[in-house]
Amino acid sequence: PTGATGATGTGVTGATGPTGPTGPTGPTGATGATGAAGNSVECSCVQQMRNILRQIIQLYPQDNVIVAMESGNNASGRPGSLLPAPNTNPNAGLFQLTNNQGVPQEAISICRIASIRISSAIYNNDITYLPAPTPSDTGCGADCQNAIRSYLPVGTTSAAINAGGQTVAQGTVLRSEYGMLVLVGPNNSSPTFVSTCKAEILTK
């Protein structure tokens, strides 16, 4: 008769077999967080306008200013303050006018200002401007802004700028800064600060 089966022995492990074929691609993962926004020439124009308004409040507190909007509307009064307060707020978005008694009047969106003219004053050479951003703004808006400044360089006489269906500035180009042109009358009178992002029709 056959005897009992003996204990199973463990042999030496054989060599590793070849790698199998690559499996199917897994599903696409979740979209990552949105990166930081690139430079916008529109923001640069607003920053330059805010910078100038802050200085107008300091240098021309008793003078009347005329603010032309991109829509064609106008507002006038004395320069009051930037809002939200204080005037040094780097994120201020409104410019508030006052009447002759210093009582606050309408608040104006800085993002919609085409120009601001100081009708009864002389240009103050102490006014300073923000430099062009680094890295430079890109895109269609930057192309238009650069073309406007190129078309109306400093010293251009009999220049006129139209926005919102009205002439918002005319005279001689005194300054050409990033996001802004300054036009003046005889002897640097009645300076007008124009956003190059809002200028529409240019003549010279």
Please report, for each region that a protein language model flagged, where it lies by residue.
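Collagen/collagen-like triple-helix sequence repeat recognition
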Residues: 1-44
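Short glycine-rich, low-complexity segments
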Residues: 30-78, 82-170, 174-204
